C-alpha cells in the first residue's frame, strides 16, 4: 500500500486530498495543528491523524520521525499554509513572521526530515502547494 504524508489536512486542499487518496487505496498520514478538527477524516480507512504545527520545529521532528519509523512513506505533500488578508502595507509584523515561519521555514524543516528517507529507499516524491495570494490581492 502506498503512503502519503499530508500537512495542513484539517481543511481545504489538504482535507480533500486526504479523502481522495484514502478513497483510492492509499494510506494517508493526515497532519494538522489541531487533530480534534479531523472530523470524518478519522473514520476513513487507512487514515492516520497526527499533530503537526509547522511553527514548532520540535513537533516537526517528532511527528516526521514517528511517521517515518512506522510507515514507508512514498509521497510528502507540503500543503499547510498561513494566510493573511488585507493591504500589504498594513500587515502587522507578527503576522508576516507567522507566514514565513509556517509557509517557508516550517515547510523546509518538514522536507528536510523526509529527504534522507527518500534517498535511502531510492525513490519518493515531494509536492508543495502555494497560494494564489502571491499573485492576486486579497483585500480585507
Regions found by a protein language model. Give the residues of each.
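Conserved glycine-rich cofactor-binding loop
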Residues: 10-11
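Conserved glycine-rich Rossmann-like NAD(P)H-binding loop of the short-chain dehydrogenase/reductase
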Residues: 24-39
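The beta1-alpha1 cofactor-binding region of Rossmann-like NAD(H)/NADP(H)-dependent oxidoreductases
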Residues: 52-62, 93
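Substrate-binding pocket helix/loop in short-chain dehydrogenase/reductase
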Residues: 87-88, 95-98
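Residue(s) in the substrate-gating loop at a strand-loop-helix junction
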Residues: 131
Amino acid at each position: 500500500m502506498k503512503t502519503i504524508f499530508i500537512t495542513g489536512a484539517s481543511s481545504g486542499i489538504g482535507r480533500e486530498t486526504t479523502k481522495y487518496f484514502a478513497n483510492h487505496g492509499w494510506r494517508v498520514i493526515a497532519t494538522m495543528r489541531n487533530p480534534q478538527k479531523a472530523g470524518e477524516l478519522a473514520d476513513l480507512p487507512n487514515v492516520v491523524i497526527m499533530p503537526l504545527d509547522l511553527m514548532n520545529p520540535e513537533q516537526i521532528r517528532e511527528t516526521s520521525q514517528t511517521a517515518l519509523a512506522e510507515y514507508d512513506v512514498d509521497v510528502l505533500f507540503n500543503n499547510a499554509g498561513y494566510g493573511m488578508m488585507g493591504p500589504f502595507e498594513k500587515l502587522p509584523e507578527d503576522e508576516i513572521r507567522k507566514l514565513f515561519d509556517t509557509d517557508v521555514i516550517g515547510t523546509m524543516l518538514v522536507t528536510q526530515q523526509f529527504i534522507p528517507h527518500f534517498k535511502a529507499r531510492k525513490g519518493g516524491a515531494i509536492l508543495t502547494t502555494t497560494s494564489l495570494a502571491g499573485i492576486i490581492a486579497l483585500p480585507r
